[in-house]
Amino acid sequence: MPKMKTHKMAKRRIKITGTGKVMAFKSGKRHQNTGKSGDEIRGKGKGFVLAKAEWARMKLMLPRGK
């Protein structure tokens, strides 16, 4: 049986917490921020927990849970 490989997109965009939840991070913070308010930019810095329906699929992409 071949080795389980980590999905490279998932490795960069999602994270599995210590309790097993799957977190992602909001987009739209890297550049072109001049028209945005400070509250909007700070809000995009936070992660959010994905819906439980997506957890199983995301965990398949990260077989080692990193």
UniProtKB/Swiss-Prot annotation:
GO terms for biological process: translation. It comes from the Bacteria. Signal peptide: none annotated. Keywords: Ribonucleoprotein, Ribosomal protein, RNA-binding, rRNA-binding. InterPro entries: Ribosomal_bL35, Ribosomal_bL35-like, Ribosomal_bL35_CS, Ribosomal_bL35_sf. One of its GO terms (molecular function) is rRNA binding. PROSITE patterns: RIBOSOMAL_L35. Binds the 23S rRNA. Part of the 50S ribosomal subunit. Contacts proteins L15 and L33. PANTHER family: 54S RIBOSOMAL PROTEIN BL35M, LARGE RIBOSOMAL SUBUNIT PROTEIN BL35M. Belongs to the bacterial ribosomal protein bL35 family. This is Large ribosomal subunit protein bL35. It comes from Deinococcus radiodurans (strain ATCC 13939 / DSM 20539 / JCM 16871 / CCUG 27074 / LMG 4051 / NBRC 15346 / NCIMB 9279 / VKM B-1422 / R1).
